Each structure stands twice: as C-alpha cells, then as structure tokens.
Amino acid sequence: YTTNAINKLNLDCIIVGSDEVWNYKEGKGNAAVKFGEGLNCPKLVAYAPSVGKSSVSDDLPEYIVKGLQRFQAISSRDDLTEQFVNSIVNKTPVRVLDPTFLTKFPMQEKSGIKKPYIMFYYCDGMSTELKQTIVKQAHEKGYAVYGAGEGDKLYEDITINLTPFEWIGMFRNAAFVFTGTFHGVVFSILNHRQFQVYMTNESRIK
C-alpha cells in the first residue's frame, strides 16, 4: 500500500509491527510510512517492532523523531528498541512477546524430503570451516543438510521458494537447527527442536 492508498481507507487506528519494521537502515519498502510519515490516521500504535542494528547514536532522519512522537502507544520486543524509543520520546515502551509466540501455526510438508536432516537458517556468524565440519559430520551420521531461505553449495537442497507453512514445516521436522536470527530461535523453541545460535548480530537475538 502507498501512503495515499492507506489514507483513503479512513482507518480509525493503525497498528505498526512487528519484526524489524523500524530498522530504517534495511532499505526494504517505504521506511518512513512505518514511522507514521504521511498517515492521517488519528491513532497510531506500535506492537513489538524492532530497530534491528539501528542506533540512537546514528544521524537519524527527521521523520523518525517526528513519527515516534505521534504514536499513542509503543511496545517493543527487545532492549535496543526500548533504548531507541526512550531516547527520542522519553518514555519506556512496554515489553511484549513477539507475535509469533501468541498463536499456533499450521504447517505443510515440503515435498521431496525423504531422510532425516539438519537445517541452517541464516547462520552468518558461523565460520566456513565450522560449517564444513558440521556438514561432514551430519553426512557421516546419515543426515541430509538443508538451508531454509538461504543458499550454500554445501547443502543438498536450497529450499528458498517455500510457502510460510512449508517454512514452518522445515523447522518442525528438522533433527537440529543452526541459526543466527531471532525467528530462527523462536521457531526452534516453538517446535521443540534442538538448536544452536551463531549470532549474526547480538541485537537480533536479544
């Protein structure tokens, strides 16, 4: 939706969130509108946003400072976002659960997977040497190796074109998960999987 399209809906309240919707450095989509820029809605609420790697020490765009001051209610999922918001509006956001913890998700089996497997999900904090060792040992123990949403020539298959429910199914059926992301941790926990974290950056897990 464009800002004009949203305004034409004449909404009474807009809820912004969650995930890294306030990571304005990410560069995906229209970052300004996620801070309320150009929205005519009388009530703006933020649920469990994250600023990702953004910092209050950055040279912040004006739309962020003005935008946050327009929100009637702000919550957050992590420490860095709390600090970020507090430094701008002088209020500490309410700490809330990421919405992925609030509901049960259906799953769908990914076709073509015939044997037990371990899975990598954006594990950028792991060295190439360690990954090669893990893959070698997995093969020796009879496990396939998959990457959910990422590519690496070490994997048997690169399951990039997954539906959301197939993606969940990849976690649910994995023997072990290696991840470097917040939601990689979340879905490993929700599906009671053994997992190991190699942090891409610390704020994404905190």
Language-model-detected regions and their locations in the chain:
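Structural motif
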Residues: D12-C13, A73, A175-F176
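Catalytic donor nucleotide-activated moiety binding site of glycosyltransferases and closely related
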Residues: V45-K53, F84-V85, Y122-D124, T128-P164
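A conserved, positively charged/aromatic
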Residues: V65-R70, F171
